[in-house]
Every structure is written in structure tokens, then in C-alpha cells.
Swiss-Prot record:
Xref: InterPro entries: CD36_fam
Reported tissue expression: Principal component of the olfactory cilia membrane. Localizes to the somata, dendritic neck and cilia of the olfactory neurons (at protein level). Not detected in the axons of ORNs, the cytoplasm of auxiliary cells or non-sensory structures. Expression is universal among ORNs but differential between neuron and sensillum types.
Region: Disordered, residue numbers: 496-525
Keywords per UniProt: Cell membrane, Disulfide bond, Glycoprotein, Membrane, Olfaction, Receptor, Sensory transduction, Transmembrane, Transmembrane helix
Membrane topology (Extracellular): 33-456
Protein name: Sensory neuron membrane protein 1
Compartments reported by the entry: Cell membrane
Transmembrane segments: 12-32, 457-477
Carbohydrate-modified residues: 67, 105, 229, 440
Primary role: Plays an olfactory role that is not restricted to pheromone sensitivity. May be involved in the odor detection properties of the olfactory receptor neurons (ORNs) rather than their differentiation and growth.
Length: 525
């Protein structure tokens, strides 16, 4: 049976409608998801792999140092007053070297190489790195804190060590040029024959203190970042490639061949999350992203905050913080014991750095008031001092990230050492670092061409097909019924006869005759 022409059009429209739905909402998403899985895995010779191995643009590396303005008063127990100096801006170039693939377990091993270049033109107004800053003497404070924890009976010996190595300092503060403490290094004279200084220097070398370079003639050179610059980190990192399971891409599975570290207690030693340079795709607002920080020997969790956008691309913003160790059971394994956990927002990283220091968000953002009230001059701001990361959720591409961390030390009070006996016994800030990444125009354009332009084209096509198909169906059905109605009307008109009252015939012509016209009968009363 042949369909009427309007119904043919309706059938074609219905086919287009169904095809549009299948293409736009079923087939294309499957193809796109499959393509993303292929592109986002760390396969050899892919664009992502090349970018992952050697980031083709510099990251922002900004250092802010706290200058102490009331040193004499602090030595007498007064609350420290600080003034932030910075930023000192450096380009940070990141590369992974000695990269090896392991097909059998879908992993890659590599070592890390960072190179820093100072950019005075992008630093704070007039900052050259030659500014003299007064800050807590990290070495003196660290020596005393370490002995006070391990062998407090030896504090008198430590005082002799300090006087011998640092030439009888009058306080616990360091006067130093900014570039010296950041990269060039300050000299620690360990060329001493006296027992106390020599013993202290021997222990320092044995412990392989972070940030120290050991030079000839028993000269040590200490800096905050100098040992990282243009030096291959000896640690061998193992991560998943994500070829077998894209949701595993970048996941840290071993460090120096060991499946976990041996620093903290319980599950805090586990590698949870990626290496921080690549993340899995298909992110939702329910996901809690995790990455492992090799600098701090721990994993950080980030949670969804809000929808954002970056250069016209829709993104999800995730935020993170240091944590509340005293009240979060999941984090208490970072403490020596649950009873020794520090207040909210501050973490003891002594076991990680082998230096008695603490980390927090800059300016003690989101830190307990018992800590923040001990220092004047801080102005915490979530926008300036928080940890944030904006991801394109479909591909998991990191578009804009700002990792900020402040390093602090304790002004320990003890009667055993003269320059320590009146200190305020508080945790104080030393410096903080902003490490940021902004995906440049080249890679934003690449992402748009590979992902969003095809997605938008298919989006336009699918809605066009659905709209066209729906209109065609409605139009076909409408015209079909219109033709039928008109046909029925025409048929009814052709079978109806006109009755002529002058025609005396009683023949029925297409109508029923009920009766002849006649006068009503007369009724006689």
C-alpha cells in the first residue's frame, strides 16, 4: 500500500528526527568519549604525552618573604610584627627525564627536573633580589628545636655549637639578601675544631638536611630552592599511563620502587591521587580530586566549589586546604599521636623535610585563631592565598591553577639558651610560595579545535535534524488530515440534492422527505 505524499514527508521527517537523536545523544557522545580516552592517556607520541614530559611554557613561581620589623621586642617576648616583601617572580620550567614505559603494568617511571629564571620585570616594584631582609634564622631555630625534641639535656651543648658556627649571634634572626636565602645560599661555616660545633655539623651532614649543599673545606651552603634549580631529583616516580583504564591516568603507584612511603602512620603513607600534572577526564561536581605532593610527602584532596570559565571554555573550580588534623580522623595519622595534632590549618612537616618546620596556607588563611593571633601584619584573603584549580571537566584538562603554601617555624622558648629564654613561644611565618599554571592561547586553541568545535558542530547538526524532523512530521500529518477533511467535505456535497418546491414529484433525491406541505386540519368546536 502506497502512503499518501504528506505521510511520506512525515515518515522522512520522523526518520531525520530519530537519526538526529541517535547521532547527537547516543552515537557522538560514545565516539567523543572514546576519542578523549585515547587522547588523554599517556601514550607515546601523543600531544598530551609530549606536554606531560616537558611543559612547553613556563609556570609562575612567586616567592613572598616576611620581613620582621620589631626584632628587639620579639627577643623580649613581644608579638612579632611582619611585613610581606614580594613577589619575587621566577619562570619555572618543568621537565621529566629518564622516562621509561612499562607495558606489562601500564606504568611510566621518571625523574623530575626544574629550572628557575628570575624575572625582575615581573617582580614587585623595584625588587631586584638584593634587598636585605630580616627573618627567623631557620638553621639556628631548627637546631634547637631538633635537640629539644630528641635530647633536651643537650641544649647547653647546642648553645656552644650555635656560638661557634654563627659567631655568637645576638638574636635568633637572620639578616640576609633575598636572593641569597632563595637560591644563591648562605654560608654555614663548619670548619671548626671545637667539639660542639663539629658534632653539630657532623649530625647535619649525616641527616642530609633539606636545602643544604656540602662544599669543600667543611663549608655548607643553605638556600630555600637552590638545590632544586637545574638539578635532577634522584627520586624515581612511577605513575599509571591510563591506556588500560583512563581513570587511572597519572596515578602515583610507587616512589623509588616502593608502593608507599614510610614517614607517617597508617594510610597517610599511601599514594592517593595523581602526580599533580595530569588528571582523569569526565569530572563531575561530586568528584574529590586527589594529588600527591612530593615536596610535602602527602596527598591533598580538592573538592568542587563552583562553575567557572577560562578563555571561553566552561570549567569546574576545585579548592583545597591543609586540613584540620585535630578534628578530622582521616588526617590524624599525620600526627605523632592523635593527642599531639596541631590546630586547624597547620601541619608539622618535620618528618618529611627533616627540618622542624610547619606549613599552612599563606597569611595563615583558614588557620585556628590560636595561631593567627600570635602575629601582627597578616591579611588572609581566600582569593589571594587559597589553593584553587579550574578544570575543563570533560577532558580533565587543568586550565588555571594556583598552588600556594606558607612555611613557618617556631620561636621556641627555653631557659637553656640565652637568646631563646624570652621568645614568645609561637609559630611564625617565614615565606610563602605561589606556583601557578595558566594554559596559554596555543593550547587553549588546540583544545577548542580538538574537543569543543566538533562538539558544537554536532550540537548544531543534531538540533537542526531534530527540529527539521519534528517540523516535517507535524507538517506531513497536518496536510494529510487537511486533505482527508477536504475530501470528506467534497464527497458529502456531491451526494446532496436541491429540492425544488415547484416540483410536484415526491421522488426522493438524496434527502428524506418527511411529509408534503399541507394546511393543518380545521377543528370544529
Amino acid at each position: 500500500m502506497l502512503l499518501p505524499k504528506p505521510l511520506k514527508y512525515a515518515a522522512i521527517g520522523g526518520g531525520v528526527f530519530v537519526f538526529g537523536i541517535l547521532i547527537g545523544w547516543v552515537i557522538f557522545p560514545v565516539i567523543l568519549k572514546s576519542q578523549i580516552k585515547k587522547e588523554m592517556a599517556l601514550s607515546k607520541k601523543t600531544d598530551l604525552r609530549q606536554m606531560w614530559e616537558k611543559v612547553p611554557f613556563a609556570l609562575d613561581f612567586k616567592v613572598y618573604i616576611f620581613n620582621y620589623t620589631n626584632v628587639d621586642e620579639i627577643q623580649k617576648g613581644a608579638k612579632p610584627i611582619v611585613k610581606e616583601i614580594g613577589p619575587y617572580y621566577f619562570e619555572e620550567w618543568k621537565e621529566k627525564v629518564e622516562v621509561e614505559d612499562h607495558e606489562e603494568n601500564d606504568t611510566i617511571t621518571y625523574k623530575r627536573l626544574d629550572v628557575f629564571h628570575f624575572r625582575p620585570d615581573l617582580s614587585g616594584p623595584g625588587l631586584t633580589g638584593e634587598e636585605v631582609i630580616i627573618m627567623p634564622h631557620l638553621f639556628i631555630l631548627a637546631m634547637v628545636a631538633t635537640i629539644n625534641r630528641e635530647k633536651p639535656s643537650m641544649l647547653n651543648v647546642v648553645e656552644k655549637s650555635i656560638n661557634g658556627i654563627f659567631d655568637n649571634p645576638k638574636d635568633v634572626f637572620l639578616r640576609v639578601k633575598a636572593m641569597d636565602i632563595m637560591f644563591r645560599g648562605i654560608i654555614i661555616n663548619c670548619d671548626r675544631t671545637e667539639f660542639a660545633p663539629k658534632a653539630a655539623c657532623t649530625k647535619m651532614k649525616k641527616d642530609a638536611v633539606t636545602g643544604v649543599i656540602y662544599e669543600p673545606n667543611n663549608q655548607f651552603r643553605f638556600s630555600l630552592f637552590g638545590t632544586r634549580n637545574n638539578t635532577v631529583n634522584p627520586d624515581v616516580v612511577t605513575v599509571k599511563r591510563g591506556i588500560k583504564n583512563i581513570m587511572d591516568v597519572g596515578q602515583v603507584v610507587a616512589l623509588n620502587g616502593k608502593p608507599q612511603i614510610d614517614i607517617w602512620r597508617d594510610h597517610c603513607n599511601e599514594f592517593q591521587g595523581t602526580d599533580g600534572t595530569v588528571f582523569p577526564p569526565f569530572l563531575t561536581y561530586k568528584d574529590r580530586l586527589q594529588s600527591f605532593s612530593f615536596d610535602l610527602c602527602r596527598s591533598f584532596k580538592a573538592w568542587f566549589q563552583k562553575k567557572t570559565s577560562y578563555k571561553g571554555i566552561k570549567t569546574n573550580r576545585y579548592i583545597a586546604n591543609v586540613g584540620d588534623f585535630a578534628n578530622d580522623p582521616e588526617l590524624q595519622c599525620f600526627c605523632d599521636t592523635p593527642d599531639e595534632c596541631l590546630p586547624k590549618g597547620i601541619m608539622d612537616i618535620r618528618k618529611c623535610l627533616k627540618v622542624p618546620m610547619y606549613v599552612s596556607l599563606p597569611h595563615f588563611l583558614e588557620t585556628d585563631t590560636s595561631v593567627t593571633n600570635q602575629v601582627k601584619g597578616l591579611t588572609p584573603d581566600p582569593n589571594e592565598h587559597g589553593i584553587i584549580a579550574d578544570f575543563e571537566p570533560l577532558s580533565g584538562t587543568l586550565m588555571d591553577a594556583k598552588q600556594r603554601m606558607q612555611y613557618n617555624i617556631k620561636l621556641l622558648r627555653t631557659d637553656k639558651i640565652a637568646i631563646f629564654k624570652d621568645l614568645p613561644d609561637s609559630i611564625v611565618p617565614c615565606f610563602w610560595v605561589h606556583e601557578g599554571i595558566l594554559l596559554n592561547k596555543t593550547f587553549v586553541k588546540m583544545l577548542k579545535h580538538q574537543l569543543f568545535i566538533p562538539k558544537r558542530i554536532v550540537g548544531v547538526i543534531r538540533w537542526w535534524m531534530v527540529s527539521f524532523g519534528l517540523i516535517a512530521v507535524l507538517a506531513g500529518v497536518m496536510y494529510h488530515f487537511k486533505d482527508n477533511i477536504m475530501g470528506w467535505a467534497a464527497k458529502g456535497e456531491s451526494t446532496t440534492a436541491k429540492v425544488n418546491p415547484e416540483d410536484g414529484s415526491n421522488e426522493q433525491r438524496g434527502v428524506s422527505v418527511i411529509g408534503q406541505d399541507r394546511e393543518p386540519p380545521k377543528v370544529t368546536m
